[in-house]
């Protein structure tokens, strides 16, 4: 429940709210001890009635905050009882001179008990302290107070003055802030005093602490109730003379009696609940007629305006209300203040009665002339303020009227992106506009299918560069404002400045110079029709918005809102390679050889294994490493979403999935969308290792780590570093040659039935890890649920020069030259062997971060076949089981297969394809395996390892989407060839010549048909029978043209 204030500036409201929020941290929690906070209620510039309301609201919130932090003294009271027993025990054994008097005070200490009523705590403590002090003074032969009606003062016995002063300062701090008790660093066990005196001093300190807290709390509570009741009475008197409905309504609310905390909370709830009903009864300013809500003045406001506004109030009040008699004889009989003398604000800021000020000023020569001049100047200023407010109100009404008219206009006809459209007048496809290019270089874009000078719609406003001419304080004067149909359904709009796209720094959106953006958006309104998100000019809208974006967003995100996307535009260039992430090595396959050209993922039986830093993999149980997966149910079948598929194909720039598919996993799966950095040139190449000993050690370590649970180590804080931290195998600083970092590349050898030797490769550059998840709770062992176990790997990136911090959410890249094969040598063994034992399990995973770098072995139920992977969702038909399409064997493990790539023109990356996931089993459901950390409390993010060839141009990347079913984005006719189990890729591509045209999402098959009995040859493109990368590019272009023709 938030507080409501009237007529205050935003900084004043923030100051009031922050004061209440941090009340317990103030040295003094008394509100009246902070006069600056009370002045922020508008004491100097608001109407008296409004100031009283703001103060009432502040006191109600202050009282509620005090009771929320009501100090609990239960533990201190128990300590006090224990100390009372200790003093009585020592008192019974002490030889007092007057045993009868001492016996009475000892009986008081024995009977000291606290009842359920906290209001009696201070009285009980005070009686016990008086008796204890008398016993201590009797033991040291000090004089007692014997006067009638006086009691012995509660004081410390036989302590130094400096120690007593420190104790008094500590107790005074407790009295001013009873919520924060600072401990006293003082030793009260003095050797010069007896045990009875030391026990009494400790009892006195504890008792005075309880008394200060209780009495200061009761004092603040009484003060709050008194101030609230006082301001309620004043507001009732102020509103009594107002005959409007809202004033009477507020006055009836204020008549509720406030006697305790519950009644105060009830009054606060009533005031906040009906705030909009009575808010107009409180003027916004002392002398302003046109405020934010234009409150109407009542007849009793004239006197208040004259009194609070000073001389300036006479100019703002109409002529008939200006008093005609001098101030000396001014009568206040009818004033609602009942005899209160008016005050006037002087130049120096002090307040003086109006009669005295008038007598002092009338003695000066020429006073009336100066007063008249001053009033005239003030009148002119006030008139300007009123006129300015009227103009602003009129302009606002005009804008609202124009917006309503534009909403009633029919939407412009949707246009498809045309690759032949041009931005500048220098192209040769439209010769009739060459004469205009000399006059204006910024030629308006013509609609497709039209020609001539009249093809541009909207005149000067429809030009894509018209926003540059009308930016600033100007606004378009002619031409319709092309508002998308999706935006016209909203009731509230706001005018924003022209949006400049990222394709061209000086280009403004073609549909309108001033864009109309809705203030409120609901998820149900985002995708309610097939024609909702069509751009009026074919360009992707340029805003970081789920509805308006020209980016590729991860459509498998199970969260409600997508992650911040990366703006992308694409064209064909050099190939890139990404290995599958989130999978473990199968039983019949070890680590494979990394090749400089990407391996065709569709020629392999199933997904590629995940490269880990030490080569440790968890095998799959049984003789069938490729476990089949059942087909998708009806609600998850992409063939049952024809409407959404058609919409996604028609609007490729809106790659956002609002249709959350039902999943059984409890942990959300997200893909880290990333932006590559320019990789440094590597100094060494990947070296293949054929060491049988290293493989044997890895398999031995696997057998031991599979049986041992994963524990949080003491290096949790060191491991869970930020996105720029560098992690090595032994958690040490990387050396200059970086020969100790070992990576295990993936392999695709399904024909082997026995565990093969794991081949290791070395990288010549350090690896950095990217972590975007939360840090798990330290000191706790977290059990990973069976259904949410997902494998993850560490994203690796070469460090160029200094170890720069990588942007969170961006993938890291590895130069492709690191993956060039070298002649295998028995001497090139791993310089850091993995030792056996459960304690060294973290070394095999290269000291991964706790949350995002954990490697969890999925169980059999979590296996995702290629038919259910997000890339296979491109097919419109229902995915077939994994058994129906047996994979073609790979003959050469070191073969090179070319894959077409996409070059980003705006710093983004293209989604080319992803090897499907590999089923992994071998551990019990819900049990951790491998050398991972249990961090299932945070969402897991499958890592992405992108390998780039050595080039100075911008690189594209291959993104691995998590195995979550998503709706198809192709029409049935366009994806008939993609219904098999072959891996497909999705790319948002533009024209090879111009990257500023509209982008389309196309699907192409990475597994091209090859001759029977022959596998992919090294160096071949492996796409559509192409032998060179250029042929592969031509094949993809032909498929894009076929899809366009199919749509038309």
UniProtKB/Swiss-Prot annotation:
One Gene Ontology cellular component annotation held by this UniProt entry: host cell perinuclear region of cytoplasm
Keyword annotations: Glycoprotein, Host cytoplasm, Host nucleus, Host-virus interaction, Phosphoprotein, Virion, Virion tegument
Composition bias type Acidic residues, residue spans: 428-438, 709-721
Region Disordered, residue ranges: 366-386, 398-548, 658-944, 973-1032
Basic and acidic residues: compositionally biased ranges: 371-386, 508-524
Highest taxon of source: Viruses
Alphabetical list of InterPro entries matching this protein: Herpes_UL11/UL32
Compositional bias annotation for Polar residues: 474-489, 730-742, 765-775, 790-799, 807-834, 977-986, 1007-1017
Biased composition annotated in UniProt, kind: Gly residues: 451-461
Main location: virion
GO molecular function ontology, one term from the record: structural molecule activity
Post-translational modification: Phosphorylated by host CCNA2.
Record field: compositional bias (Low complexity): 462-473, 671-687, 744-756, 835-854, 865-883, 911-927, 935-944
One Pfam short name: Herpes_UL32
Cellular localization per UniProt: Virion tegument; Host cytoplasm; Host nucleus
Residue positions with a glycan: 921, 952
Subunit structure as annotated in this protein's UniProt entry: Interacts with host BICD1 and RAB6A. Interacts with small capsid protein UL48A; this interaction links together the capsid and pp150. Interacts with host CCNA2.
Described function: Participates in the last steps of viral maturation and release. Associates with nuclear capsids prior to DNA encapsidation and later preserves the integrity of nucleocapsids through secondary envelopment at the assembly compartment. Interacts with host CCNA2 and thereby blocks the onset of lytic gene expression to promote establishment of a quiescent state of infection in undifferentiated cells.
Family: Belongs to the herpesviridae large structural phosphoprotein family.
UniProt protein name: Large structural phosphoprotein
Gene: UL32
